[in-house]
């Protein structure tokens, strides 16, 4: 098969997803990386979907109140809920980035575990992981503040019209903390932050190990005597590739 950017596509196979290969203990922290990466990506996806649902509902609420208000008032009403819209967008963006950075590392580790990467790539990967972790943390803090202490409000109409609009369009509620979906969004996002931080830490530890001993299996990189077939090999110090 073709080789793209140095990756031999013939090495990709469905068998790589099997338990025996995925959790092969010969590779340093391979099992742990797969577990925490998947937790960060999957729980992040759940947080992203919940935030997207909330964003969609509050955006529709804004339009519905504006359009319906002309039937109960001479002036159109405006719903002010930009805070939760901004919090949802921030959550969505950083959860997508979590899936991008750790998803890429997941598949590289899955299909090409012995590949050695240039230093600039390792540095960029670690730097992006730190930035994304910080971004998820910021998204979690902002979302917590908005959902637990803020609420949307209506302007442009009298109090009677406001009450009627709220009665007609009661869901999602103007008080963000009164909606279970928003609470679920917060819980999932904080769990995502913890898993993302753990993924970043274990990525740093694995990168340091690979820089010192190379990405070869422990039976090769530590014993450094012969392969599983009994063929002698010599390892270049720190490179992680047989010569």
What are these regions (language model features)?
Residues 11, 30-47, 51, 85-149, ...:
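Signature of small four-pass
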Residues 59-60, 94-95, 152:
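Short low-complexity stretches enriched in small and charged residues
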Residues 60, 107, 160-165, 199:
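Short, highly charged low-complexity linear segments
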Residues 144-171:
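Juxtamembrane non-transmembrane "cap" segments at the membrane-aqueous interface
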């Amino acid at each position: 098969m073709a080789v793209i950017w140095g990756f031999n596509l013939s090495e990709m196979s469905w068998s790589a997803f099997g338990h025996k290969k995925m959790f092969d203990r010969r590779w340093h922290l391979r099992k742990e990386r797969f577990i925490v990466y998947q937790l960060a990506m999957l729980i992040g996806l759940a947080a992203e979907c919940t935030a997207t649902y909330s964003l969609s509902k509050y955006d529709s609420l804004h339009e519905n109140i504006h359009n319906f208000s002309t039937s109960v008032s001479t002036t159109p009403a405006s719903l002010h809920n930009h805070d939760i819209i901004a919090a949802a967008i921030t959550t969505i963006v950083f959860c997508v980035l979590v899936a991008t950075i750790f998803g890429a590392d997941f598949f590289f580790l899955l299909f090409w575990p012995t590949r050695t990467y240039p230093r600039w790539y390792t540095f960029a990967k670690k730097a992006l992981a730190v930035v994304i972790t910080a971004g998820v943390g910021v998204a979690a803090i902002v979302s917590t503040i908005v959902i637990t202490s803020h609420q949307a409000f209506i302007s442009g109409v009298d109090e009677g019209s406001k009450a009627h609009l709220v009665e007609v369009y009661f869901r999602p509620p103007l008080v963000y903390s009164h909606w279970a979906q928003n609470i679920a969004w917060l819980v999932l996002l904080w769990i995502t932050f913890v898993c993302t931080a753990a993924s970043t830490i274990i990525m740093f530890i694995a990168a340091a190990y690979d820089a010192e001993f190379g990405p070869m299996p422990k039976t090769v990189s530590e014993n450094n005597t012969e392969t599983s077939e009994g063929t002698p090999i010599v390892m270049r110090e720190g490179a992680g590739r047989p010569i």
